[in-house]
Amino acid sequence: MLIDAIHGAKMSTKLLVSLKVLVIQLNPQIGQVDQTIKRTWSILDKVTKSATYVKPDIILFPEFALTGYSFHARKDILPYVTKKDEGPSFELAKSISEKFQCYTIIGYPEDDDEQKLYNSALVVNPQGEQIFNYRKTFLYDTEMNWDCEENPEGFQTFPMDFSKCAKLSNEDSYNRDVTLKASIGICMDLSPYKFMAPFNHFEFSSFCVDNNVELILCPMAWLNSTSITDKQTLHNNSLLEAAKNKIAFALKEQGLPLAGSQGIYQLKIGDSQRTPRVPSDDSTSEYKDMDEPDMSNVNYWILRFFPFLYFKSRINWFKNSSLIESILGKTRMPLDHEYYKDGKHKEDTIDLLDSEEVIKDTVLEKTFLGTSLGQPWKFQGKNAILVLANRCGTEDGTTIFAGSSGIYKFNGKKPKGSQDDDESSLDSLNESVELLGNLGKGLEGAILREVQFEVFR
């Protein structure tokens, strides 16, 4: 039987991994690249002078970290697009990686050799070399304005090598090297495709579970819900003006200019303060308390990683024969995505059919809502680290970004004392996700955490 095949897996060794992760939160404004770079170095200088500073292994920046985000036409963004191995974003990442001997991941607007434009994130290794470039797979409405292209590859994984960051459980120090499987998701990648795909497809997080991703890195420009996104309002001058006045008043109440806060830094460096768990029903999206995270969005981000969360009802799905149909009918990407328009999927299919592991790869490793044919919760007993770098500030007087950058650990555990009839919370109350710390919604700054987790080799 197919389900029995999974039990033929080889025995694996558990490694304990320790990484120092630094997240930078910025408020970049269009036309202010140099100023944003200057503030970045100012933040990094303050980070290194902290009494609790430790050298980071990874530094993650937001989506479009230096350029600003709200471009309304192709001609508006063209002065800021660059090739993947040149330009201000690459040069900054290269300098940071060489200085700190770490990986740097930064979001930027890309112009490829065929003059196609992408919303991308580049990865620079500790030697200052660009080793991976990811292009956003699911696009937000704003990107349509400047002819952004979908990533024809779809979601991807890539290896990240870390020196002396791992050990066996019976060893005292982290003296082993480890290669982690990583994946990047840029903002809208976390949401349903075009906001029209079924909510419970959880495309990106399902991809990560299916492919045993251990390190999930998300540069973002995610909005606070007080932003003006309603198309009827945006296309009605009187409604738009009233809505913009409301935002301006909210900013004034917080003592902020129309662009939001810049140059006032919130630093959470090396402490162990975790983000308090707040149920979805109690979280507010009001734009106040700039040094506190937007828990409404934090809870939503956690929900979008549902396949990583403990959920008791999975045992019932596992017993249901319709699970097989759901898994076998699952496509790699939504069928109207660019992935299916250039023949790439046909190449992938040929490669798959040539593999001796075709049954395991196509069936046993696939999940629906986190459930596979081999086990009710495929992620059970595993660990993964999620790092979200979101920008803050305001653009156009209409768009407020949610900030709240943070670091999370999915521990793969059923909550202690949980009974079979207990309901599973699908927000920050779910104990299978650990909130290792968040920045506030409205301030630039940095958060540095040492994260410890298990991987199997």
Curated annotation (Swiss-Prot):
Its EC number is 3.5.1.-. It holds the Pfam family CN_hydrolase. GO terms for biological process: protein catabolic process; protein modification process. It is an enzyme of class 3 (hydrolase). It comes from the Eukaryota. The active site is at 63 (proton acceptor), 136 (proton donor), 187 (nucleophile). The keyword Cell inner membrane does not apply. Gene3D superfamilies: Carbon-nitrogen hydrolase (3.60.110.10). Residues 19-453 form the CN hydrolase domain. Transmembrane segments: none annotated. One of its GO terms (molecular function) is protein-N-terminal glutamine amidohydrolase activity. One of its GO terms (cellular component) is mitochondrion. Keywords: Hydrolase. PANTHER family: PROTEIN N-TERMINAL AMIDASE. Deamidates N-terminal Asn and Gln. Component of a targeting complex in the N-end rule pathway. Belongs to the carbon-nitrogen hydrolase superfamily. Present with 1640 molecules/cell in log phase SD medium. This is Protein N-terminal amidase.
